[in-house]
């Protein structure tokens, strides 16, 4: 009996060991399979304006030897909120860093979210972690965030010279000497030093490194050896460049006019400087991968390259900046390479900054925390491989993401907002309102381009004063008779809107120091505005200041502009309530290429407090659109299949049922938590047969169509 009991006990022990040993072996195998992981993050780098075309080394290393995600997006086009998303894997409404000020390294961030960053998770998984470069905009350098073994972060925002860093707990100050102070090179040098030292001393331990470059963020100081490059480069002039004003878009763009020659010169020079700063990043990437090759670590290292958001330079008349829910601000470079990642391949599926944290943890063999909202990119790679082999066991990839900026209050029902907006922007209503103005009811006097008249059907119609139009207008085209009246109404309303904005001083760009006298000069010509611009092509009507330039030679205009004026808009006056404005002067840039003094200075308002929105960005085999709701109750919809530059707000062409479904999906994504966000990131409704075609024909509500070529 005792013998049988012993045998039974031995059997139990053997059975328990049998259960335990595979677990331990699996665990060891999991740790042994951990790879090094590097995240390379740039600051304000676009993809829409062509910046990657000027980084050949990075393109070869990351694109040709890795995978490009052509639909790489950020879920918010603002620095600190986007970076907080990258570090946590959370949407903005879950980490509550809504702006570059509010909670950017604030109390909630430090007490809650910073303690659950990818650095903490990777460190706990046995990685040696390092962070170098820009952290968050309001980081004051007084502490080292949890999770980082090696820490070299700039205090506050990006700079290239004259900055302070927290280097492993010690504050370091840097000057203006290129060889030892240039921040981009310093980030590269210290990153290489970290890798080299780590591999030589701790080769058995995987490392995780975030390299956060300042380029091409302002003040856009290029390294001296690159300051001569890219003269006359204008790749930033996309289809939406200087397409303004836009009465069918949100409040700010309704009040942003076309750029004049000085503004255009500014965007050209700023684009050039941005590309120049990226050359140091390009060299740094090459040096980084050369070192990994020398240390025999390429086979064992994953790398991700992306930016915190995009940028605009003249798009829709906006001189510079981010913050907008358009492709140029939300779409970013997005590349990945490493073991098992296909080479020289492009994926079109939507990926975002919310996916970076889950991806880095997946590489480390760490299960994704339930709180994270994104998904590992390795799952997408596996899914593509499975599809290629006709295996569909994995969950399908998303086709929709949330784009958000700021806190959204409770709004009225979408149907009520839509009807109100549709009524406001209806052509007939707008035509009636405009034609009631006395100046359009008078007979065709010299210089007048349009006349309104009332028909027997009690409707306003417009009459073109043909004797006052130039026969030399190259922009005028022969049109079909059936479309003649409707096209004339389009042209008239566009012209009237632009004139109304200019007469009302509502243009939020280009206020020069001598704006007082420019305004007086314009006042003398307002009654004759038609004389100044008889050839009124809707896409070529200029900013009001441009009208003065048309009457003055360039030499005289520059001389006139430099002369001090009474009542001028001084730099300290460059502000408007609820607006974010800046003054550009010749002293703004300290390094070549410099702003020509003869072009003077100007004020520009690039953002406003009511530019708060939540959007759906959807892209799949049948649909490709952006749907947005603004805090002002404004609604917009852009169909990329027919309008890739987002020139037309086509919301009035949507069926009300589709609109309500889009609004419902947006509402659910706005409040999603944890893994719910992935559930609401699939547009199931768009697969309904009756909703395959999102649009219906309501031509009278398509307010501003671009000229057909």
From Swiss-Prot:
Which parts of the sequence carry 3-oxoalanine (Cys)?
79
Q: Which annotated residues bind Ca(2+)? A: 43-44, 79, 308-309
Any single biological process term in GO: heparan sulfate proteoglycan biosynthetic process
UniProt PTM: The conversion to 3-oxoalanine (also known as C-formylglycine, FGly), of a serine or cysteine residue in prokaryotes and of a cysteine residue in eukaryotes, is critical for catalytic activity.
InterPro entries linked to this entry: Alkaline_phosphatase_core_sf (IPR017850), Sulfatase_CS (IPR024607), Sulfatase_N (IPR000917)
Required co-factor(s) are: Ca(2+)
What are the boundaries of the signal sequence? 1-27
User: Where along the chain is the active site annotated?
Assistant: 79
GO MF entries: glycosaminoglycan binding; heparan sulfate 6-sulfotransferase activity; metal ion binding; N-acetylglucosamine-6-sulfatase activity
Q: What's the short name of a Pfam family annotated to this entry?
A: Sulfatase
- SUPFAM superfamilies associated with the record: Alkaline phosphatase-like
GO CC terms for this protein?
A: cell surface; endoplasmic reticulum; Golgi stack
| The protein's name | Putative extracellular sulfatase Sulf-1 homolog
Question: From which organism does this entry originate?
Answer: Caenorhabditis elegans
**What gene does this protein come from?**
sul-1
């Amino acid at each position: 009996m005792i013998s049988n009991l012993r045998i039974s006990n031995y059997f139990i022990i053997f059975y328990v060991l049998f259960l335990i040993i595979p677990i331990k072996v699996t665990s060891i195998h999991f740790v042994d399979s951990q790879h090094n992981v590097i995240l390379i993050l740039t600051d304000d780098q676009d993809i829409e304006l062509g910046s990657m075309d000027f980084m050949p080394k990075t393109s070869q290393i990351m694109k040709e030897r890795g995978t490009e995600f052509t639909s790489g997006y950020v879920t918010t086009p603002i620095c600190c909120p986007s970076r907080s998303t990258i570090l946590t894997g959370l949407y903005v409404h879950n980490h509550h860093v809504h702006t570059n000020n509010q909670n950017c390294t604030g109390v909630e961030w430090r007490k809650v979210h910073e303690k659950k960053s990818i650095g903490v998770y990777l460190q706990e998984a046995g990685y040696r972690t390092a962070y170098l470069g820009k952290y968050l905009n309001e980081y004051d350098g007084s502490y080292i965030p949890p999770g980082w073994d090696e820490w070299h972060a700039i205090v506050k925002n990006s700079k290239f010279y004259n900055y302070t860093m927290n280097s492993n707990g010690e504050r370091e100050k840097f000057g203006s000497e290129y060889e030892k102070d240039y921040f981009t090179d310093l980030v590269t040098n210290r990153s290489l030093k970290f890798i080299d030292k780590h591999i030589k001393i701790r080769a058995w331990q995987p490392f995780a490194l975030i390299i956060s470059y300042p380029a091409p963020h302002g003040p856009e100081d290029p390294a001296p050896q690159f300051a001569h490059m890219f003269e006359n480069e204008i790749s930033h002039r996309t289809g939406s460049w200087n397409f303004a004003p836009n009465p069918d878009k949100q409040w700010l763009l309704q009040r942003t006019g076309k750029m004049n020659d000085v503004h255009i010169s500014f965007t050209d020079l700023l684009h050039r400087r941005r590309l120049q700063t990226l050359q140091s990043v390009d060299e740094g990437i090459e040096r980084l991968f050369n070192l990994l090759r020398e240390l025999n670590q390429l086979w064992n290292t994953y790398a991700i390259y992306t930016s915190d958001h995009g940028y605009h330079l003249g798009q829709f008349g906006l001189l510079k900046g981010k913050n907008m829910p358009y492709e140029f601000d939300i779409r970013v470079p997005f590349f990945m390479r490493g073991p098992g990642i296909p080479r020289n391949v492009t994926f079109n599926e939507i990926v975002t900054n919310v996916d970076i944290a889950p991806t880095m943890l997946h590489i480390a063999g760490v299960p994704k925390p339930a709180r994270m909202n994104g998904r590992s990119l390795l799952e997408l790679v596996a899914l593509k491989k499975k599809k290629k082999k006709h295996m569909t066991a994995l969950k399908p990839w998303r086709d929709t993401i949330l784009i958000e900026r700021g806190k959204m209050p409770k709004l009225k029902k979408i149907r009520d907002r839509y009807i109100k907006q549709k009524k406001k922007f209806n052509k007939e209503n707008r035509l009636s309102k405009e034609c009631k103005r006395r100046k359009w009811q008078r007979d065709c006097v010299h210089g007048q381009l349009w006349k309104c008249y009332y028909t027997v059907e009690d409707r306003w119609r417009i009459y073109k004063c043909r004797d006052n139009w130039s026969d030399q207008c190259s922009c005028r085209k022969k049109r079909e008779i059936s479309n003649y009246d409707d096209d004339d109404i389009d042209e008239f309303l566009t012209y009237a809107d632009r004139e109304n904005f200019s007469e009302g001083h509502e243009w939020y760009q280009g206020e020069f120091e001598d704006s007082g006298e420019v305004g007086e000069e314009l006042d003398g010509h307002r009654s004759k505005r038609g004389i100044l611009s008889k050839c009124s092509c809707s896409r070529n009507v200029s900013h009001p200041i441009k009208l003065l330039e048309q009457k003055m030679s360039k030499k005289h205009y520059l001389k006139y502009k430099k002369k001090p004026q009474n009542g001028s808009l001084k730099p300290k006056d460059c502000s408007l309530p609820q607006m974010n404005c800046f003054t550009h002067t010749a002293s703004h840039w300290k390094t070549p290429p410099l702003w020509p003094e003869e072009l003077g200075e100007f004020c520009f308002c690039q953002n406003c407090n009511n530019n708060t929105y939540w959007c759906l960005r959807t892209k799949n085999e049948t649909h490709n659109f952006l749907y947005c709701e603004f805090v002002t109750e404004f609604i917009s919809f852009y169909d990329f299949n027919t309008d890739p530059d987002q020139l037309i707000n086509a919301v009035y062409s949507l069926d009300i049922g589709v609109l309500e479904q889009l609004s419902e999906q947006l509402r659910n994504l706005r409040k999603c938590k944890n893994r719910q966000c992935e559930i609401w990131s699939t547009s199931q409704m768009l697969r309904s047969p009756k909703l395959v075609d999102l649009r219906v024909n309501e031509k009278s509500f398509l307010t501003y169509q671009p000229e057909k070529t």
